[in-house]
Structure formats: structure tokens, C-alpha cells
Amino acid sequence: MRPSGRALNEMRSVSIETGFTKHAEGSCLIKMGDTHVLCTATIEDRVPPFIKGSGLGWVTAEYGMLPRATNTRMRREAASGKQGGRTVEIQRLIGRALRAGVDRVALGERQITVDCDVLQADGGTRCASITGGWVALRLAVNKLMKAGDVTMDPLVDPVSAISCGIYAGQPVLDLDYPEDSEAGVDGNFIMTGSGKLIEVQMSAEGSVFSRDQMNELMDLAAKGTSELAEMQKAACA
């Protein structure tokens, strides 16, 4: 029995509110249960030096958590003068994931930065950031297309992410914090709307797992990301 009472293959309730901020070219507030993340996308007419003059675009991401996003206050990373290792890892993951769904030639030589700010955390913040980040990216690109700044849609496939794990001996979809903190196996799965894999992160937290168990988690992830892709499309319609 899951603490939330959800079925093993049931996600938390998900909502995506677009246009949450007025200044960013694309924005949304995504809620996956009690995990809430504000995602914004900013278009800039520049690219990193290593691709300047190549004609290729770039999508990157930044990630952060508000001090009271969790049950105890965290010190702002800006106050310490540097980002923590976890933050750097997650924002690189978000950037990699989103770029997998982008035709960088069609995007043209410009950069889109996706900022993901966790307002409240209850497990799965990186997955919510990727899923909401794609929505913000989609909305920003829509503005480029409407203005005629790009001639072809550079977004080739929706990108979303979901966590899966083994909790109390059972494979479960979309772990919240109580489950995540006690899971024997924990994994994050990033997939395209067409069902292709972008990245899989799995680790044995308390017990090792078999190939069959991994396949069960993969099936759950495919179900979850397919549902999220439909929600993304509906939010951007």
C-alpha cells in the first residue's frame, strides 16, 4: 500500500498553468502532487562561444530551490557564493534532456535558457522541471514562429520525465518524498513523446534489482511519460 493510497501505476495529480509570468517568452507553473516548479524560457540572440558562427542554436537550463521549498530552510546558494554539486548536476540534466527534442539547425543561432525554480518540493523535482521546462520552451518557440524568426519548427518531439522505483517490494510510478526516502530502488526516466529514451538514471538505494524489475519500471515510465506528453500538448494548445 502506497502512503498516498495511489495505485502502483498511478501518477500524482498533474496541472500545468501556462503564462504564469508576464515577462518571459514562455512560462508555466507545473504541479505534480505537492511538488511545484515555476519554469520560464528566455530567448537571447547569442550562443555560447564554442558554437558561435556554426549556425546552431542552443538550449540550456538553470535550476534552483527556494529556501523553504522543503520542510527545513536551506541557505540560498547565492549567499554561499557557489552552486552545490546537486544543483549543477540537475541543471545539466535538464539542459541535456531538452536539447534532445530540439533541431538546433532549425532553431538558428540563438540561445533559449530555461529556468526552473522549485517553489515546493515533495519528490521528483528534476522530473517536474524537465516536463514543465519543455512547456515553457514550446511556448517561447511558438513566439519565434509567430514572429517569423524561424521558418521550421525546431521542436521535434515533446520531452518529459517521471520517477519510478521499488517501494515496499513493489514497482511504483511517480514517487513522492515519503516513498523516495524509503525506496529500495530509485530511477528517473526521460523520454520523448514518441516513446524513445533520452536518459535513464537508476540506482539501488537499499536493495539490488533484477533485469525483469528494471523492465517493469521502464514500462511504468513509458506509461507515465506518455500521459505527460498528452498533458503538455493540451497545455500548449
Curated annotation (Swiss-Prot):
Catalytic activity of the protein: tRNA(n+1) + phosphate = tRNA(n) + a ribonucleoside 5'-diphosphate
Record-linked InterPro entries: ExoRNase_PH_dom1 (IPR001247), ExoRNase_PH_dom2 (IPR015847), ExoRNase_PH_dom2_sf (IPR036345), PNPase/RNase_PH_dom_sf (IPR027408), Ribosomal_Su5_D2-typ_SF (IPR020568), RNase_PH (IPR050080), RNase_PH_bac-type (IPR002381), RNase_PH_CS (IPR018336)
Pfam family, one: RNase_PH
Keywords: Nucleotidyltransferase, RNA-binding, rRNA processing, Transferase, tRNA processing, tRNA-binding
Molecular-function annotations in GO: 3'-5'-RNA exonuclease activity; tRNA binding; tRNA nucleotidyltransferase activity
Keyword RNA-binding: yes
EC number annotated for this UniProt entry: 2.7.7.56
UniProt family annotation: Belongs to the RNase PH family.
HAMAP family per record: RNase_PH
NCBIfam families found in the cross-reference section: RNasePH
Subunit structure: Homohexameric ring arranged as a trimer of dimers.
Record's protein name: Ribonuclease PH
Gene name linked to the record: rph
